[in-house]
Each structure stands twice: as C-alpha cells, then as structure tokens.
Amino acid sequence: MAQITMSDMLKAGLHFGHQTRRWNPKMKQFILTQRNGIHIINLFKSLDMIDKAYDFIKATVAHNGTVLFVGTKKQAQEAVSAQATRVNMPYVSERWLGGMLTNFQTVSKRVSRLKELEEMDFTDVHGSGLTKKELLLLEREKDKLAKQLGGIRNMNRTPSAMFVVDVNKEALAVEEAHKLGIPVVAIVDTNADPESVEYPIAANDDAIRGIELLTSLMADAVAEGLLERSGKAAKAEGEAEQPMAAWEKELLTEGAPAAEAPAEAEGETKAE
C-alpha cells in the first residue's frame, strides 16, 4: 500500500482541477465540488486509486516486469527522469517519438547507434581518421540521440506497464501502449478521460509538487516490487542449494549393486 496521507496530497495541491468550463463529464464522479470556477477533486477517491495503481505496479515489477515512466511536459520532466533513474526503470522526459513502442525494432536500432557513438573519442582527430567537422557532426548526432533516447537506452523490450503524468499531453504514448496491450497508470485531471487508461489517478497534473509526489510514489512501488523479486530469487536459490537429506540419499542408493554403490555415491558428490 502506498505511504501517503491526505495532508501530503493537500500540501502538494493535488485537489485542484481545471476551470469548470474545461472539464470532462466523465470525471464527474471524482469531483467533490467547485470553488471560484475551479473544480475540486475528491482526494478520498484519489487515495483509493493511488493504492490500486501502487499495488499493480509493485506486482508487475515483482513478476519481472518493467515500467516505462512518461512525462514530457516541463513540470514533469525532472521528476520523471529522476525517479525512474532511482529505480533503474526506463523513461521518456523529452518529446515522445512516434513509434517508440509500436515500431520498437527501429527505435532499438537508433539506441544501438547512440551506444556506438558514445564509444567514440571526439577529441581524437588523428586516431579517428576523421576531420574535425565530421567529428563535430557525429558528436551533435550523439547529443541529439541521447536527449531523445537516453532514458530508454537500456530498455531491451517493450515495457510491461507505463506510468504517465498527463494523458492528454501523452495521448500518442497511451495510444501506442493500448495497441500493444500495455496497461497504463496515469494522473488524470478534470479535463481528461479517466476511461482512457486502466489505472487512472484523479489528481492535479500541472502542479510540480503534486507530480513529484505521485511519481515518487510510483517509483516506490517499483522499488518494493524489485525487493519482492530479489526475495523470491534468493529463496529459490536457497532452496536449490539446500543439501540433500540423508533419507533422500538412501533412496538413490537403495537396491543398487554393492559394487556400483561407491561409484554412484561419488557421482552424487560431484552433482552436489
């Protein structure tokens, strides 16, 4: 369960929606009231939605899944890149490139190109066999690719789930995820459609503090999932290394010819 209180959410301004004239009627059930022409979100319902999203992400990661963090609006860029990096998950904080998921094979080739360029020494004009101008152009290419794809450079396959800060801003990313059957967790403000994603979180998607709070929570869910995953691995490893009981060894040698028993016992020792 997510470690968050109503006080945390209020201080982060998560209850402020958009102007009443800009609302999406599908958000009606998550709106508590309106004040000075602004919709106020029902944070009690938001808390339940956060818990569901948190548990989903935790379970996804615990079962060897990956979560792609997406937030390209200015208010979200720093939080998305920092929190995804904290838990070693891929992210997109710059412009979403069309086909980033649906044409993943081509995108992967561009990532390979980025890694290739990162191996180059752009100051070694003599050793590279290239001119200064050629090296400068290659360095610019590397910088451009790093900005566009740096967050997914270690994403070897399409993600198991996606966390999005603003479903309207990231409509293309959400669309691509749905085409591939990838579940989406998203912050959904009063001007958005909560039915467009599997795990909506009704909240202000413009306040920097609010974005940081929710993005950090989802990263915490990833961290818990990773701990659970490593715990399962350690348990499985421990069970594999558990020495064979005496009665189990007897079963292996029971009824074996006396002359062959020592050889079999020796074989058991090697196997262990």
Swiss-Prot record:
InterPro entries registered for this protein in UniProt: Ribosomal_uS2, Ribosomal_uS2_bac/mit/plastid, Ribosomal_uS2_CS, Ribosomal_uS2_flav_dom_sf
Gene3D superfamilies in the record: Glucose-6-phosphate isomerase like protein, domain 1, Helix hairpin bin
GO biological process: translation
GO cellular component terms, A-Z: cytosolic small ribosomal subunit
Keywords, comma-separated and alphabetical: Ribonucleoprotein, Ribosomal protein
Pfam families, A to Z: Ribosomal_S2
Region Disordered: start-end pairs: 251-272
Compositionally biased spans, kind Low complexity: 253-264
GO molecular function, one term: structural constituent of ribosome
Family: Belongs to the universal ribosomal protein uS2 family.
Name of the protein: Small ribosomal subunit protein uS2
Species of the source: Bifidobacterium adolescentis (strain ATCC 15703 / DSM 20083 / NCTC 11814 / E194a)
Source lineage: Bacteria, Bacillati, Actinomycetota, Actinomycetes, Bifidobacteriales
